[in-house]
Each structure stands twice: as C-alpha cells, then as structure tokens.
Amino acid sequence: CGSPRGFGNWSYELFKQGETNNDWESFKYTTLEGEQVSAEEIEQAKQDLDLRTFQQEYEATFVNYSGMIYYNFSRDKNIVEKYKGNSLFLHIGLDFNVDPMCAVVTVIDKNVVTVIDEIQIYSSNTNEMCEEIKNRYKHQNIIIYPDPSARQRKTSAGGLTDLAILKNFGFDVRCKNTAPLVRDRINAVNSKLKNVAGKSTLFIVNTCKNVIKSIERQIYKEGTHIPDKDSGFDHMNDALGYLIEYNYPIRRNFVPTEQKRWS
C-alpha cells in the first residue's frame, strides 16, 4: 500500500500481478476516494505540485518517467530578461562536485523563486567557492542550501567539513540531516516550474546560460527513471534542487479528516 513510483520498479510489477495472476488482487484508491484528506488540502496540492506529481501522489497513477527530466520547463514561460525586485537576501543552492563546483543564486519573493546568477568553478573546493560568493555579494545577506553530505564531506584541506567551512565564512546554512530522494528533488523543481493549474513560480534570468542549458538538456537514462549524470548537466540542477526541495518539499504528511460515514 503506497504511492506509485513510476513503471520501472517492483511496486508496479506487483500491482500488475492482480491483472494477470488469479492468486492476486490489485486495488486502486485515489486520495479523494479514501476520504482521509480534505478537499481544501487537495486544492492546495494542485497549487503546490505539477501535474505528474499530483497524479502520482493523489490519483494513484503510475507515471512514466522518461526523456527530459524537467519536462515542465519552458523557455517562453520560465525565462525572464532581468530581475526587478529586491535582492538584499540571496538564497544559494550549492553542489559540492569539484569539477565543476556549482552554485545557483536566487531571490525568493512571496514563494516566487528567480535564478539571478550562477557560479561554476572547475577544479575547485569549498573555500574557493565561498571566497567567490563573498567577492560577488559583499552587501547581501546570504543563505546557502548545500548538499546534506556537507555534514561529513571534505573538499578542502584542513580537516574541516564543508558545512563547517560554510559557517566559518559567516553564511546562514540550511540543509537537512539526510539527503532527500532524488525524485523528490526533481518533482519539487518541476512543481515550481509549473503546477497543476499551469502557474509558474520558478524563473531564470536569461544570463544564467549554464542553468538554462542544464535544466533543458538533462535526461533520464534510457529505459529507467535514473537521471543521466554522464553529460555533466546534473551539477547545476542538483544545486538548484537542494534549494527548492528544502523550501518547497513534496508533502506527504496528510492531515486526516474526521470520518462521518458511520455517523
């Protein structure tokens, strides 16, 4: 019993047994049919999630994950010429891969995320990235969302973890104790690119060429729901995903409604 996770996994194979094996029975109940979640929460989910994720989490649908990973990305809808708001507070997603090490710089205003800059440094380490961020943004308040592996990982000499280095530079660091599922990160980004209602709350300034190229070109490995990392498009996407998933996670802690069926 649980939410479907695409076609390429054991739960789909077990579910199909109910259609072909007389010793098995398979049942499908949507969240609405289960009457455990209020209609208001369902409507809120439509605002928070993209169509495929909503179908998976609320409509008990096995969704095909193949081809373009960030399928909700549109050059017409998600790319803007410039950001005109206040950039006093910067939110930066950080991927610790050393070749290249990538940072995605954003502003968040009323749940709208705009990518305004990108940093990509080859053969680098955490100290160098921190120095570059400090040099570029001397007057802004900076919040960094790194890969949770920063709690143990060391990309610089000196014995300090990446998390300790970030804090030593004076950054406000926010990361979970454990890394979120890759698919949850992807679904969170797709949901910001466009929700069920067709509304976009994630935009990219057109000067961020590497972010745009990465989000547009990363695909799944053929016949799987495993993101391809051989092309090098994963680093910027991972950096963005850590930030988005931390602030806008895919919620599954539904609040049950009071049952009135037997009253």
Can you say where each PLM-predicted feature lies in the sequence?
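Acidic, Mg2+-coordinating catalytic module of metal-dependent nucleases/exonucleases
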Residues: 229-251
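Hydrophobic/aromatic beta-strand patches that form the interior of the parallel beta-sheet core
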Residues: 25-27, 92, 145
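ASCE P-loop NTPase helicase motor core
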Residues: 1-49
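Short acidic-glycine loop/turn motifs at beta-strand connectors
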Residues: 20, 107-112
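Short beta-strand scaffold segments in enzyme catalytic cores
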Residues: 101-107
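ATPase catalytic-site recognition across NTP-hydrolyzing enzymes
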Residues: 34-94, 99
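A residue-level signal for conserved active-site and pocket-lining positions in enzyme catalytic cores
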Residues: 1, 29, 58, 103, ...
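Mg2+-dependent endonuclease catalytic cores in nucleic-acid-processing enzymes, primarily RNase H-like
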Residues: 112-227, 250-254, 260-263
